[in-house]
Structure formats: structure tokens, C-alpha cells
Amino acid sequence: MPKRTSLQNMGEAGEACVRQYLEEQGWQILAQQWRCRWGELDLVASRAGELIFVEVKTRSGQGWDQKGLLAVGIQKQQRLIRAAQAFLSQHPDLAELACRFDVALVEQRPGKEGVSYALADYLQGAFELWE
């Protein structure tokens, strides 16, 4: 089994931060790091008849890509939509729920006691399904 990279660990820490945020908002996490041939869904959650697919971007600094937002371009959105469709085909009981694609931007912050992770921005309905 390959070694985990610090980027993978940072990504997982960012996902854990967003997972906690969503659970505090009353969302039930249905899947984390769900994979299919089209890619990975970082988080899938439901609440009150609504289903969200959350793409989490974790960055250690300001960077050039607006804290990860620019990394969710058209091609990435298309892969996420296909992955969401694959998820729904495997979970037909969820197919009638209203679906939304959100993007969570997480910052890694250095501190005296090590690094911490904080939700920098949460974009509800960051993009939509197009025909």
C-alpha cells in the first residue's frame, strides 16, 4: 500500500472540518470519499428532503487559485455531476430528493501547537446541473 502524502492528510483534515460543520448544521453524512469511475465525491449529506454533494478544497496559504475555488472549473464540475449521477443510480431511494452542489474552502493555519483547519468559505449551490 502506498504511503499517504501530506497533501492527502491535509485534504482529509479539511474534509473532517467540513463534516463537523455540516453535522453541526443538522446534516446527516451519507458518504465520505465516495469513488466511482468519474472521480470522487468528498462528502454527500442529507437533511429535510435535500441532498448535497460537497467538494472540499483545502489550502495551506492564499495561493493563486482563490483558496481552491478556481480548482473547481467546468471539467471538475462535469466530473462531479457524473459522479453524483452514479451515486444516485446506486442509491435510488435518494433520487427524488432535491440535489445541490456545494463547495467548501478550508484553510490550514499554522499555530504554536501545530496546524489547525478552519472553514474559510462555504458556497451553497456553487454550480448547477446543466443539460
From Swiss-Prot:
Any Pfam family the entry gives: UPF0102
Matching CDD domains: PoNe_Nuclease (cd20736)
One term of GO molecular function: nucleic acid binding
Family: Belongs to the UPF0102 family.
Protein name: UPF0102 protein CYA_0708
Organism: Synechococcus sp. (strain JA-3-3Ab)
